[in-house]
């Protein structure tokens, strides 16, 4: 290995090192500094997001009042940095403002106790009370004309309400990215409110944006969980693999610098430091664009855009081409007689280099798989470097990777075939059965939500070319399973889920895949309520109808976990016919009341 490069790699693991997002000199007034850097519009948006993510139950108007007060205070500090309280940290200033909310105790209960603490404990306390499942339901889009009227009457309020509604539903949303989506939202309404058919223009665009927003939220939640539960090292390893795939022409020293900056930025956003996070993200985009020649040939178009679009574009940019004539991996990591010496002198650096070199050569692998391979390589070196003949011991380490690569390949192949055979709804139901049998203690709404999300892997990834399927599918599954882990952590009910969620971030998906039917589960009593429905079912949107049916399927399995596929098919078929019949009846409610008990009796007989 080239030792000049090796020494430069040490900088990756020195948390103080960073040329782009540097630790700035202390400013007399932090809030004035951030206001000047970000500008009033972005400052206001970020403060609104911060308050909405902490105080998720408060009405929009209350947040607007707080934002106005903080903004006016910041302007005062810009005019005179030595004015009263301008020297306070952002946590102190925003925390003090949160604690002035009169309804804090009534709305948030013990969260009000946080206000008795001093910083930094107070902010940590607020973070612990963020609710990943606040129960507000999906954002309902009002009628197109009403939306356009509201947009034209007060654009700033309209977009502020959008930021508020997303932020309070997603308390870990990546704040600068949410400002970007608000700009996109504005663009949709600017265009569609001038269209002849406003609804025809708005509906598909708003739906497409909603999907992007939900995906963005889930990805950032995984990053925050990675930092919070597994530490900075885990996040940096993930980032090394991802950026090495995306920027394979960049030197490792460059990748290491970007990774260090990214870790700082995401730590700030996950920690509620949204002004610092957005400011540092803008600095990183600036650095990347100034140094694009040494990073990627694909960045030129991104770098001509305004700051929010620029950062988003860089995060989504296509992979660069692999450099020609890369030496075989084995040269530095198997055949070199100094492998153990290099490893033992700087373990994380040596493994970081391995991960970089392996990832840039394998854009078709998922990040999770690359990290599992690095873990296997580390375990092999730990074992072999303690033997009398290390080179002989680790000579075939790359052969040991084969089962680790084949397992997700086979899983994706099998599940894509099942998806192609059953379609998305049928595939979701197959996963629902699979996961309810594995972890029946998990609540029915969570099992339905997670299985529906897992089922979307088919339409998201199985339609991709073969070379892209694995990366797409496994990285998507990591994001969805993190949602299960986050919800389960709040109300833990299954030791199996806790074990898979907490033992290893990179092995979460294989851990869940390997779970068998839980033989220790004591079945629930049969409840007629499971099949008690009313006429309102008929007017529900298709997705909500599916959720009702899928909830019934889960409850059936919790009652009869050993039910065969044939039995389930019979009962769910009867259920479908029952719904169709009553929704077509003249007196729907009477039909549901009369036919419901018959369905219950038939279901009990079928499952007996």
Curated annotation (Swiss-Prot):
Prodomain positions: 19-24
Alphabetically ordered keywords of this record: Allergen, Calcium, Cleavage on pair of basic residues, Copper, Disulfide bond, Lipid-binding, Metal-binding, Methylation, Phosphoprotein, Repeat, Secreted, Signal, Zinc
Modification sites for Phosphothreonine: 444, 446, 570
SMART domains: ALBUMIN
Listed Pfam families: Serum_albumin
Post-translation changes: Phosphorylated by FAM20C in the extracellular medium.
Expressed in which tissues: Plasma.
Sequence positions bearing Phosphoserine: 29, 82, 89, 443, 513
Function: Binds water, Ca(2+), Na(+), K(+), fatty acids, hormones, bilirubin and drugs. Its main function is the regulation of the colloidal osmotic pressure of blood. Major zinc transporter in plasma, typically binds about 80% of all plasma zinc. Major calcium and magnesium transporter in plasma, binds approximately 45% of circulating calcium and magnesium in plasma. Potentially has more than two calcium-binding sites and might additionally bind calcium in a non-specific manner.
The protein's name in its UniProt record: Albumin
Species this protein is from: Felis catus (Cat)
Phylogenetic lineage: Eukaryota, Metazoa, Chordata, Craniata, Vertebrata
């Amino acid at each position: 290995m080239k030792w000049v490069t090796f020494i430069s790699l040490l900088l990756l693991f020195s948390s103080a090192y960073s040329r782009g997002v540097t630790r700035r000199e202390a400013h007399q007034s932090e809030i004035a500094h951030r206001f000047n850097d970000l500008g009033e519009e972005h400052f206001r948006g970020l403060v609104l997001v911060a308050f909405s993510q902490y105080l998720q139950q408060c009405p929009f108007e209350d947040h607007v009042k707080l934002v106005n007060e903080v903004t006016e205070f910041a302007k005062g500090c810009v005019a005179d940095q030595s004015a009263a309280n301008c020297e306070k940290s952002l946590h102190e200033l925003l925390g003090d403002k949160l604690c002035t909310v009169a309804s804090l105790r009534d709305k948030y209960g013990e969260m009000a106790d946080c206000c008795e603490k001093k910083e930094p404990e107070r902010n940590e306390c607020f973070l612990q009370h963020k609710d990943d499942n606040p129960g507000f339901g999906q954002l309902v889009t009002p009628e197109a004309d009403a939306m356009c009227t509201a947009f034209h009457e007060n654009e700033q309020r309209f977009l502020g309400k959008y930021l508020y509604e997303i932020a309070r539903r997603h308390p870990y949303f990546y704040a600068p990215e949410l400002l970007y989506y608000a700009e996109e939202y504005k663009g949709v309404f600017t265009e569609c409110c001038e269209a002849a058919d406003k609804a025809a223009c708005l509906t598909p665009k708003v739906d497409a944006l909603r999907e992007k927003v939900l995906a963005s939220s889930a990805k950032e939640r995984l990053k925050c969980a990675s930092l919070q539960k597994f530490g900075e090292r885990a996040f940096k390893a993930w980032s090394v693999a991802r950026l090495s795939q995306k920027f394979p022409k960049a030197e490792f020293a460059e990748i290491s610098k970007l990774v260090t900056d990214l870790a700082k930025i995401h730590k700030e956003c996950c920690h509620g430091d949204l002004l610092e996070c957005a400011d540092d993200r803008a600095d990183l985009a600036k650095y990347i664009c100034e140094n694009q020649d040494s990073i990627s040939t694909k960045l030129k178009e991104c770098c001509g855009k305004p700051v929010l679009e620029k950062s988003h574009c860089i995060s989504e940019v296509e992979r660069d081409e692999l450099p020609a004539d890369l030496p075989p991996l084995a040269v530095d990591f198997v055949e070199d007689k100094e492998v153990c010496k290099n490893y033992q002198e700087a373990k994380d650096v040596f493994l970081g280099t391995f991960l970089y070199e392996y990832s840039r050569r394998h854009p078709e692998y998922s990040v999770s798989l690359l990290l599992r391979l690095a873990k296997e390589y580390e375990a092999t070196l730990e074992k072999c470097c303690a033997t009398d003949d290390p080179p002989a011991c680790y000579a075939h380490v790359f052969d040991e990777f084969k089962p680790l690569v084949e397992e997700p390949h086979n899983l994706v192949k099998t599940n894509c075939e099942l998806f192609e055979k059953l379609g998305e709804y049928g595939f979701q139901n197959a996963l629902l059965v699979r996961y309810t049998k594995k972890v029946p203690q998990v609540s029915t709404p969570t099992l339905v939500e997670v299985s529906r999300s897992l089922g979307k892997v088919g339409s998201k990834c199985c339609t991709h070319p073969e070379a892209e399927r694995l990366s797409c599918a496994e990285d998507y599954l990591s994001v969805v399973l993190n949602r299960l882990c986050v919800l389960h952590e709040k109300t833990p009910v299954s030791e199996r889920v806790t074990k898979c969620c907490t033992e290893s971030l990179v092995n979460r998906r294989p851990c869940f895949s390997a779970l068998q039917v839980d033989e220790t589960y004591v079945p629930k009593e049969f409840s007629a309520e499971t099949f008690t429905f009313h006429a309102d079912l008929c007017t529900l949107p298709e997705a909500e109808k599916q959720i009702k049916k899928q909830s019934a399927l889960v409850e059936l399995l919790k009652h009869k976990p050993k039910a065969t596929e044939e039995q389930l098919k019979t009962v769910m078929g009867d259920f479908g016919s029952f719904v169709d019949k009553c929704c077509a009846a003249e007196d729907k409610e009477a039909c549901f009341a009369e036919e419901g008990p018959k369905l219950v009796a038939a279901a009990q007989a079928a499952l007996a």
